[in-house]
Design a protein with these regions (language model features):
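Edge beta-strands of extracellular beta-sandwich domains
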Residues: 161-165, 277-283
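Forkhead-associated
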Residues: 87-150, 156, 204-274
Length: 283
């Protein structure tokens, strides 16, 4: 027997089976007459019923907060045994305080952290970290070369340094006009001071010419036993009247202490106490 297209799944007077169902699947379905209402329409074309406002403005949702553009999280790269590496903190509120006694980002066993040490907060669409007056500061890994100034602190490997001005020459004769005999002073633009635990000064290096090189070997200041420091790790240099901190493509990076607050970007690293955190921002 021969069949034509009108005899298989279709009548001459009615629509193809399933057409109405497909229209309903593509559009809002009127709750009064079950007719399909095209997107953007405020009324049902068949019965005139109102389309609910939520159906007109229905937005697609993300599966989770991590998918939302501009939202960030912190990944613990290096932490104490209690917290563990790989732990993450999703920053989905407005402010997120980190510290030894903080609720949002707690590090209770890190005695180098202040009770409320730092705050990770959003300013518009930007993520910012703010030092909450902590004792030991907030350090951010630099990218290439950054300006610094006298009094700034920075870290290389496990070492903490401070940039100091060269003291003025106050040498002169005693009351009887006798001079104290000492090594001659070499002109120096600035000096780098190692800061020991407790705040005491350690090694002091005056700049030779216009720079001080720091590393594990063959530098102006050497730390051969610091396994986290690269052979040539970083340098501080003066150009004109300005100072700059330069990372020498070190493996573990160079970190500078922020003043007040600093904007963060995807891929930044932040040191809080003994904890190293990586910033990840959803594009």
């Amino acid at each position: 027997m021969a069949y034509n297209c009108r005899e298989v799944g279709r009548s001459e007077s009615g629509p193809r089976r399933g057409t109405r169902g497909m229209e309903q699947a593509r559009n809002y379905v009127c709750t009064e007459c079950a007719s399909a209402v095209p997107s953007g329409h405020k009324f049902c074309g068949a019965c005139g019923a109102n389309v609910p406002a939520e159906a007109q403005t229905l937005a697609t949702r993300f599966f989770g907060a991590l998918q939302m553009p501009g939202k960030a999280r912190l990944i613990v790269v290096r932490g104490d045994e209690a917290m563990g590496e790989g732990l993450s903190y999703l920053l989905q509120a407005t402010e997120h305080v980190a510290g030894r006694e903080a609720d949002q980002i707690p590090f209770p066993s890190d005695n180098w952290l202040s009770p409320s040490h730092a705050n990770f907060l959003y300013r518009g669409e930007k993520l910012v970290v703010r030092d909450e007056g902590s004792l030991n500061g907030v350090y951010i890994r630099i990218r290439g070369t950054v300006p610094i100034q006298i009094g700034d602190h920075f870290m290389c490997g496990q070492q903490l340094f401070r940039v100091d001005a060269t003291p003025k020459d106050t040498s002169g004769p005693e009351a009887d006009q006798t001079y104290f005999y000492a090594s001659p002073r070499r002109p120096s633009a600035f000096r780098i001071t190692q800061v020991l635990e407790g705040g005491m000064d350690g090694i002091v290096c005056c700049a030779r010419e216009q720079s001080v090189q720091i590393g594990r070997e063959d530098c102006d200041i050497n730390f051969p036993d610091d396994v986290y420091m690269s052979p040539r790790h970083a340098r501080v240099e003066m150009s004109g009247e300005s100072l700059a901190l330069v990372d020498e493509n070190s493996q573990n990076g160079t970190y500078v202490r922020i003043r007040g607050e600093r904007e963060l970007s995807h891929g930044d690293y932040v040191f809080l106490g003994r904890n190293l955190l990586r910033v990840e921002v959803t594009a």
